[in-house]
């Protein structure tokens, strides 16, 4: 494995989700008994742990194949890799987005990488990837 990056949700996102669950727990406590409240609290805690796991994203590159979560592409189909700053990423996520593009973006991370593709079997023009280590990905893929 040449490159591996795991993007996990920040603690403030998980805390916000958990506080939403706690409002449900409080409502259950007001309407029912303590046993129902404890069950709801346990389920809410387990749901938050599951959500934290489900929200993570993994980028790997082994020298031949770039994998982002379930998507993968061979390096021979990559044409141009460009690191995007905060403002470029914001525009490409919204106004300038191509509906056919593959988006592997996380709202809590403002920077990323645009990877242009040239696969004749695939109409996807580019991948837009959220990454904290965009410079490193670009250096590896532009070789």
Functional labels for PLM-detected ranges:
Residues 21, 41-44:
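Alpha-helical transmembrane segments of integral membrane proteins
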Residues 124-143:
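C-terminal/domain-terminus segments
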């Amino acid at each position: 494995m040449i490159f591996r990056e795991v993007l996990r949700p920040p603690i403030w996102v998980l805390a916000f989700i958990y506080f939403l669950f706690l409002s449900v727990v409080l409502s259950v406590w007001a309407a029912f008994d303590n046993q129902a409240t404890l069950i709801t609290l346990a389920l809410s805690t387990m749901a938050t742990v599951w959500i934290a796991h489900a929200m993570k994203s993994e980028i790997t590159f082994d020298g031949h194949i770039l994998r982002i979560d379930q998507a993968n592409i061979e390096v021979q189909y990559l044409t141009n890799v460009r690191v995007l700053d905060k403002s470029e990423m914001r525009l490409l996520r919204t106004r300038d987005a191509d509906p056919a593009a593959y988006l592997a973006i996380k709202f809590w991370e403002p920077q990323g990488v645009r990877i242009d593709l040239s696969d004749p079997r695939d109409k996807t023009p580019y991948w837009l990837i959220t990454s904290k280590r965009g410079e490193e990905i670009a250096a590896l893929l532009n070789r």
